[in-house]
Structure formats: structure tokens, C-alpha cells
């Protein structure tokens, strides 16, 4: 074997190693370039109330309807503000004192909120997320609740008590919507995490939780039955 042959074989071996290295690095580079990471994720917690403790939904519904019949101030507020149905939002702040079932509901909600908060990785500085208020909503046929947020709270949500067929769904809005001035609309079959709006059809016995800054609305109740739910806010304790 001549000296030139030896050098050629050595050069060929080095070239093979170089090509292998380039191929590996190029794969790593193209892999990184193709990676898409979900950032600034909006979390929606959906669970059954009974998954953390027993609760008599039938008793809760009877209590809601009984309070609605007796709360004259709440009825007047609904009439003055064009609310189609009944809400205790502006009239009662002591539901847990009126019927024991609301105290049971609070204990169950506390557990669900604790589960949700743990997943959100909040730095609470040794303070707690505690119930701030809860209120009854009873929407009549044709009733709805316009788009809104819950300012000054951390976690908001709704427990669903009685949801007839064709009752209004709850719809959430992408919180970045006001910044999408030049963005084209999403496809109708876009993935859930990419949609501008997300609608959820609740069922009785279900609880939904979200961060209070998330804009949402209740769509029109298309059923002749009443849509009964209990909404609530949790705050960061002092």
C-alpha cells in the first residue's frame, strides 16, 4: 500500500466522521427550528363537584329556588336591571349562613380551588386563596349574561345545579383578542387551544374554574326550563 493510498484512506475516514457530525448537528438544528412551545397558557378546570366529597344537588336546587322566592330585594334588582330570571348577586352575601347545604358546597369548592391553584404554580407567599363571595343564578327561557370579567379576584367559577336541554352554554374569549388587529380569523375546525372562543356545555353537578381575568359570557337559554347555577369568587387573603 503506497503512502498516497494510506493518506487517501485516512482522509476518507475523517470526511466520513465530519459528515456524520454535520448530519447530527443539522438534525438538532432543524429539530429546534421546528419545535413549537405553548406559551401563556389559559387553564380551564372542569370537574364533578362530587369528586372531592358528597353533595346533594337536589337539596341545593330546592334551596336556590326557595331563596329566589323570598328575596324581594334580589327580585327588584333583577327587574330594575333587566335580568331575565333571578340572581342574588346584588342582594345576599350570606348564603353559607342561610342553609347548611351552602356550607357543604363551600367546603367542596375549597378543595376544587386548592387543586386548581396547585396546578397554576402561584407563589402565594404563605397566604391563602379564600372564598370571597358566592351567588345564585336562575336564568329563565331567553335569558343570558353578557361578556364580563371578575375584577379584584383570583379564581372565579360556577357550580351547575340544574341544566335543562338547550340551556345556554358558557363561552370563554381569548384574552389577547384586542391585540389581534391584523390577524386572520381561525379556521372553524381549529384546534381547541387555538380557537378565539371556547364554548362549554355544562351539566348538573359539574364545576368550572378559571382565573378571574378571563372574559366569558353565558349564551341565551333556549330551554323552557330554568338554568340554575351558583357562581363564586376566590381572593388572595391578606
Please place each PLM-identified region on the residue numbering.
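Catalytic core of Fe(II)/2-oxoglutarate
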Residues: 189-238
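Short N-terminal helix-initiation segments at or just after the protein's N-terminus
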Residues: 75-82, 94-106, 152, 171-180, ...
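Non-heme Fe(II)/2-oxoglutarate
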Residues: 26-123
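N-terminal amphipathic/basic-hydrophobic helices that include classical n-h-c signal peptides
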Residues: 1-32
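Hydrophobic residues positioned within well-ordered beta-strands of beta-sheet architectures
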Residues: 45, 132-134, 155-157, 228-232
